């Protein structure tokens, strides 16, 4: 709530007042398959409009599984979105959106690498069938939302009703290829069936605009049910050390309710100076239930015969205040302070969870930011820059503990992120443009007592085999995982006219980031992704009115092999200790064609 750490807003297109349709097809030479999308939109009657959009994907993956000869992960997905807009009068309209998605991914995207060297991700893996199901992911989801707007004079009353549902199952294997050569046994595998549904309702009132004081007030409510099953299988055969076959199981159930009231006001002191303030009060209630058991096997390899029950009731008040000043109509400066919060919760999939370790605390953040937004040189140059300082209290973290082979969810006492962000766009002529976005940040733990041992810590500082040593560990000053000091995105676009009717549109983009830890134990070897840059390009040909087009598209043309996360798969869970890392998409070249009606 009031999230200074960032939020994502996705707005899809609505029905149009005139008929239109489009279709686009993409064939990937590297993923060996097509992607087809299209939409049709227009009025059904004078008061009702509709838009239907669909997308289908049938592509192979970018990693060869040497066990079955398949390129993984294979992606088969279908998505459909229907949007209806009903406007019987000038003062009322209602928008209904229904979205359905079905996705099946066959195979995995993790590969093995040595524990004692920097990351060496390959584009091959070896993964055999496990007893609990084929490796991959299946997801089915429904999203339904209805938004009604009623004009009451100069005021607007808005109602938003939402329903969300998904069920999924993820089955994980881990690459059995031994980095030194050969393969090893499929000794550990797991599955995570999930089920979620939520109802929500929001009502808000928007005041007239263009006045000295403008405001929005509203209320929000949601209720949700979440269920998670965990199956952990083992097939270990290390003679003289450990011979074990078993299946462990945990079950988690949670019901939650959330209610909030909020308001935001803008006070226009002058045409150039304004203050924007907001305040949100939130009440959250949750009930959670957890239990574990041994489904099969001679004994529990981990402490699974545990139960936990808990409930929480929390309330938060999250304010923000922003001052904006227009030096000119093209240059605006601002400064803002905001407080955000995230409700606490329950550990859902850690073996051996008890009442004492079941609950984690809510997270709070404070953010100070200042910046300038400007449009200069008669619109040919756009410059924006901002600086920020964000602090987190009880930062919620989920860390993989390789000594226990479990993910542990809890709170870091405090953390902070400071940085500067900037963007620029330059339009030197009508058919040429350049854009640049860059950011520098310093994100670290300020205080984290009881943290899992880091790979860089000597055993005299933190010994994972000694509970007292691990409990006394504090990794204050260590960087937050998955955060780079520097990141950037650069793009150049040129439009070349071929006579009066046709054009060639060329776009080249370069994006990258500096090194970062992508393993929870922050190994300076297998757990650190080095800095990289990825080159993308697109060349499109078609008429000026864009009725149709053909294009060649290249992504990651430098073929950088980067990883999203990594962890240590240790002995004796496997006879061949190795790093497991998740390989991001490699080079992909495709051809695209589209037509508009």
List PLM regions with ranges:
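Outer-membrane beta-barrel proteins
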Residues: 26-35, 57-89, 124-142, 184-200, ...
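Solvent-exposed loop segments that connect transmembrane elements
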Residues: 63-71, 108-132, 173-191, 231-251, ...
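Outer-membrane beta-barrel domain signature, strongest for Gram-negative TonB-dependent receptors
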Residues: 69, 74-216, 222-224, 382-383
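Membrane-embedded beta-barrel scaffold of Gram-negative outer-membrane proteins
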Residues: 145-174, 326-342, 359-427, 433-439, ...
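Gram-negative outer-membrane beta-barrel transporters
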Residues: 214-216, 275, 389-391, 410-520, ...
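Structural signature of Gram-negative outer-membrane beta-barrels, strongest in the C-terminal barrel
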Residues: 85-89, 205-208, 220-222, 252-390
